[in-house]
């Protein structure tokens, strides 16, 4: 009983601390534009990463205290590795990429991981695998386009395929939890 009460207090405190950390993260998204000094900007962007990982840790610590299953901690560690890999690979492969955009992408992924893990662990694992695959593709596509110049000339084809795919979701998509998110092709969800 005492352990459970302590866990509840920690979880409640973590909720408020996460709100404060998200506010600090958001504030730094705007303040980074106020500095011309590259070192100061890098410090702010690195601090954003620290804030993001603190939010991530607090959320998963709270889930672990509530659920008490080791799989939550393992899944947390996998996500940390994925997020670190994204930050490092994007800045290494694309040194001119906006670090703020990369940070915001990782922050949104973190929030998504937290939300879906709270709802369904199995769906969260599936989503994490999809996110890792999407990141791998997003890292490879620009390199491939640079190597095969003709691919960059097919913009209208990509646009058309995207519009047709979105229209297919609207027309034949199956509704789950009030949203049409995809459709089935030969028993495979798209």
What is each residue range found by the language model?
Residues 8, 39-190:
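Membrane-helix boundary/helix-loop-helix interface segments in multi-pass membrane proteins
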């Amino acid at each position: 009983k005492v352990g459970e009460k302590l866990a509840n207090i920690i979880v409640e405190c973590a909720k408020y601390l996460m709100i404060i950390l998200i506010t600090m993260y958001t504030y730094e998204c705007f303040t980074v534009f106020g500095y011309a000094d590259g070192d100061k900007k890098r410090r702010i962007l690195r601090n954003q990463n620290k804030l993001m990982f603190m939010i991530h840790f607090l959320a998963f610590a709270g889930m672990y205290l509530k659920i008490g299953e080791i799989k939550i901690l393992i899944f947390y560690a996998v996500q940390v590795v994925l997020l670190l890999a994204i930050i490092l690979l994007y800045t290494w492969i694309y040194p001119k990429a906006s670090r703020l955009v990369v940070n915001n992408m990782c922050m949104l992924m973190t929030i998504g991981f937290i939300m879906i893990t709270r709802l369904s662990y199995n769906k969260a694992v599936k989503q994490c695998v999809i996110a890792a695959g999407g990141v791998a593709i997003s890292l490879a596509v620009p390199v491939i386009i640079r190597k095969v110049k003709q691919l960059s000339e097919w913009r209208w084809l990509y646009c058309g395929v995207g519009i047709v795919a979105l229209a297919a979701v609207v027309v034949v998509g199956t509704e789950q939890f009030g949203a049409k998110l995809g459709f089935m092709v030969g028993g495979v969800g798209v």
